[in-house]
């Protein structure tokens, strides 16, 4: 079973409409909020892989690297959907501009993120995870 940490509470509350992002994998969704060390301490005790489902922006990448990848290395990964480049093309420029000053020198320690970070800077846009919530009837 793969543990998926969901950064945004709206996404967590409507997680069924985003299950498609994880294919046929058996997953356990957990909320990153409220922020505390409890989730990290629990993850340390179990052998499962961890996927971080957060915003596709520099702040989200910073959160993932400092709170998860730092502790588990390649046992942790950042969800990068197949269509993220198309979504970034029409993403949020204002949020990118706001974050750029703070995170422009962000050191990427998980090399699997180099492509995503390159796209973010290339388009000068970010994409919030709420965009992956599909409309569906429960």
Regions found by a protein language model. Name each.
Residues 52:
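Terminal peptide-recognition signature
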Residues 3-10, 117, 126-127:
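Active-site cores of enzymes that catalyze phosphoryl transfer or operate on phosphate-rich substrates
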Residues 79-138:
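Long, charge-rich alpha-helical interaction segments
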Residues 42, 63-71:
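Short, aromatic/basic amphipathic alpha-helical patches
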Residues 59-61, 124:
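Glycine-centered small-residue hotspots that permit tight backbone geometry or close packing
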Residues 9-49, 59, 77-84:
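Acidic, glycine-rich catalytic loops of TOPRIM or P-loop NTPase phosphate-binding modules used
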Residues 3, 76-77:
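A residue-level structural signature of the nucleotidyltransferase/glycosyltransferase Rossmann-like core
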């Amino acid at each position: 079973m793969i543990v998926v940490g969901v950064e945004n509470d709206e996404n967590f509350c409507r997680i069924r409409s985003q299950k498609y992002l994880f294919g046929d994998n058996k997953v356990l969704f957990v909320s990153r909020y409220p922020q505390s060390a409890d989730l990290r301490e629990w993850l340390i005790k179990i052998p499962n892989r961890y996927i971080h489902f957060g915003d596709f922006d520099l702040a989200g990448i910073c959160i993932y690297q400092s709170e998860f990848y730092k502790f588990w290395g390649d046992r942790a990964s950042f969800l990068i959907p197949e269509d993220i480049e198309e979504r970034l093309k029409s993403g949020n420029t204002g949020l990118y501009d706001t974050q750029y000053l703070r995170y422009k020198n962000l050191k990427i320690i998980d090399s699997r993120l180099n492509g995503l970070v390159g796209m973010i800077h290339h388009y000068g846009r970010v994409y919030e995870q709420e965009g992956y919530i599909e409309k569906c009837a429960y």
